[in-house]
Amino acid sequence: MPAIVGPIYIMSVTDNAAASFGDVFAISPKSVAHSGAGSGTFQLGDFVKINNQTSKTLFKDADITDETVSFNG
C-alpha cells in the first residue's frame, strides 16, 4: 500500500542539518549552542547595506543550566 508523505521541510543545510518529512510531532536537538550578535550581523547576500547608528547587544544567560539533550537519543 503506498504511503502519502506530507510536506518536506529543510531547516538548515550545514553539518548539523535538520529536515522533517510529513507530519512531525517533535524534533529533538542533539546539540545546543548559544550565540549573541548585534543587529545586522547575520545578513547574507550581495550588496547588503546596513545602517545601525548606535547599537548594543547585551548577551547575559541568567539561568544556571539549560535544557539537557542527554535523553534525546
Curated annotation (Swiss-Prot):
Superkingdom per UniProt: Bacteria
Q: Which Pfam families match?
A: gerPA
Q: Which gene carries the instructions for this protein?
A: yueG
This chain's protein is named: Spore germination protein-like protein YueG
Give the UniProt family note.
Belongs to the GerPA/GerPF family.
Give the species this sequence originates from.
Bacillus subtilis (strain 168)
